[in-house]
Design a protein with these regions (language model features):
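Outer-membrane beta-barrel "beta-signal"
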Residues: 283-285, 303-319
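Outer-membrane beta-barrel proteins
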Residues: 29-39, 71-79, 114-122, 159-171, ...
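Repeated loop/turn-to-beta-strand initiation elements of outer-membrane beta-barrel proteins
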Residues: 12-22, 58-65, 99-107, 144-154, ...
């Protein structure tokens, strides 16, 4: 969210600058994974954002988002199935400070709280709670003479996923993102660079089941085109790599290192409808191929291959 500071004189004038939107979103995701055991695991997730409200006060350089989502996930493989239903509340807070000469600095905090239940052949109503925290200082720049600029942030994240008798998974990490861009008339060209490092711990009743370090890097070229009818078309293509180092894990997995190749494409279109409405549709396809190192040369080389598709739509009413 980019908010430009405007000087104010009194409370009533500040209140007059209040604006935002309300609306709903829907996302459908399919995953197909051919895993190391030679099995194919299918996963289907429907996410309905029942309500999203965005509020902005430019005079205060402050913005906030609140959303409520229902999430239904179904997993299927030979001899096993799993269903999870969840309700997610989230909030995002953004405070911007204008530095001058085209620079803005922001502090962003995101909090998501997800409460759900899992049903499978082995459990009924297994309670799950996931809490995700993200804190991001951001720095943006735009030069109107060059018609160019950049967006950047660093991030600290912490996530805790509690699956009751199935155990707890905690993730803690940092990331850095830098995205320069240049506009040529209706066209905009950019590229996003990203690096992340996370420490992951899984434990049950105090016993470590898995402890690993995950690092990911990618670059993502971005092309945008703005139509005269207030529509925007964009294409993003990601080329990335990931590495998981298992320092302390179950016996079969101890000290193994996993290497992942990541490819992802995103195509989207956003359209203003009149003065009050904005609609968007977006499609994503991701492909990931992972393999692991072996200590025994007699081990057979195997892969974990993921294909993932997402379709996302939203409609917002602006005020």
């Amino acid at each position: 969210v980019h908010i430009t500071w405007v000087g104010s004189t009194d409370w009533s004038e500040e209140q007059a600058g209040f604006n935002g939107h309300v609306g709903t979103t829907f996302e459908y995701e399919t995953k197909s994974t051919d895993n190391y055991l030679g099995k194919t695991v299918k996963e289907y997730t429907k996410t309905h954002e029942i309500f999203q409200a965005y509020f902005s006060q430019p005079n205060w350089q402050f913005a906030a988002i609140y959303g409520l989502k229902s999430i239904d996930r179904r997993q299927e493989e030979k001899g096993y199935h799993e269903n999870e239903t969840s309700l997610q509340n989230y909030i995002s807070l953004n405070k911007t400070f204008t530095i001058g000469n085209g620079f803005d600095f922001s502090l962003v905090y995101d909090l998501m709280y997800t409460d759900g239940n899992i049903d499978s052949p082995y459990v009924t109503g297994l309670h799950t709670v996931t809490v995700d925290n993200s804190f991001r200082p951001t720095l943006t720049y735009f030069n109107s003479d060059w018609n160019a600029g950049f967006y950047s942030n660093v991030e600290y994240l912490y996530s805790r996923n509690d699956k009751s008798s199935w155990g707890v998974r905690e993730e803690e990490g940092q990331s850095i993102l830098f995205q320069p861009y240049k506009r040529f008339g209706a066209w905009e060209f950019g590229i996003e660079f990203f690096y992340q490092k996370k420490h992951n711990d899984e434990f049950n009743h105090g016993k470590i089941n898995d402890r690993s370090i995950y690092t990911e890097t990618y670059y993502e070229p971005i092309i945008k085109y703005a139509f005269e009818n207030a529509g925007n078309l964009y294409l993003r293509t990601r080329f990335g790599h990931g590495k998981t180092e298992n320092a302390d894990s179950l016996q079969y997995n101890a000290n193994r290192t996993y290497f992942k190749t990541i490819r992802k494409a995103t195509l989207g279109y956003e359209q203003n409808i009149g003065d009050d409405w904005i609609a968007k549709i977006e499609y994503k396809h991701a492909w990931e191929k992972e393999h692991k190192n072996f200590y025994d040369p007699r081990d057979e080389e195997k892969y974990n291959v993921l294909n993932q598709d997402n379709i996302y739509v939203h409609a917002f009413y602006r005020f």
